[in-house]
């Protein structure tokens, strides 16, 4: 099964790209649950990861592999501070909530099957997220 996940990348040309990227939905391990995401807040830390030091007034719509994307320009003076991000696609979303749709074999994971949970652990701007049961 596949799902969409929001990711952000700073390109060498000084453009930040926020895009919906298609990924595989993972199978939960022994102590994990698979959650169908129903809600995820937007926090300042999420905005920092999505846009970095980009100039928000430069935002423009684009498309990546048939999915919507947003492009923003990073001022030249800010590129040095953001250099470690260049070329790295980074999943966005610190926390979220949703319903457990699959569980590993651990009793604590099985006990959450079908329940609505809140969780943290990053990568929450997606259709599904697999997390250790301790993060619920």
Task: Give residue ranges: language-model regions.
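Generic structural motif
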Residues: 98-100, 129, 135
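Extreme N-terminal starter segment of soluble prokaryotic enzymes
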Residues: 1-3
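A structural motif shared across PLP-dependent enzymes of the aminotransferase-like
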Residues: 121-133
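Short glycine/threonine/proline-enriched tight-turn/helix- or strand-capping micro-motif at secondary-structure
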Residues: 15-24, 94
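Cytochrome P450 core scaffold surrounding the K-helix E-X-X-R motif
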Residues: 45-50
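Short polar catalytic/cofactor-binding loops
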Residues: 7-13, 40-42
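Glycine-rich beta-strand-centered segment in the early N-terminal region that forms part
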Residues: 26-41, 54-121
